[in-house]
Amino acid sequence: SKRKIMLKNVIKKNKFLLILFLIPLLSSCSGTGSKIKPTISTTNNGNTTIYFTREGGFVGGGILAKIEVDGTEIGKLGTKEHVTHNVSGNYRIKISGAGISGFGIGTDSISGVADGKNYFYIIGVKQGLFSMKFTINETTESGYKQSH
């Protein structure tokens, strides 16, 4: 009957939309970061370098994590990517989803003080029942080196 044909068409269209929505969430994207961990600077020249790494993982792997320091974007990290940034004075870091696939993903932020030391941050994804958000946590140098 006509009703069955209409119902089949609706199901086909919804399957297509569901697949279209899931592909960016489940696939792994490359960002602007490096897959190679940066060399950690040990010279105490008064500069503060902040080091970021994005955890590996399946959930949210297709969504790039946009990193902003003091309102300026410094990179978009895919899973297992790294980026560094030099700062002076107090700084504020904000992590959010990049692009259309990042729309609706929760954000996280953290603050720090540039005091001539290196600081290390791990970016992750926390999944709730009906939501997902990026997280940022400060770690030690050894925690950073062991991440992934």
Q: Which positions does each model-derived feature cover?
A:
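Short, Lys/Arg-enriched N-terminal segments with co-localized hydrophobic residues
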Residues: S1-I5
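Bacterial N-terminal signal peptides that target proteins for export
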Residues: L7-L17
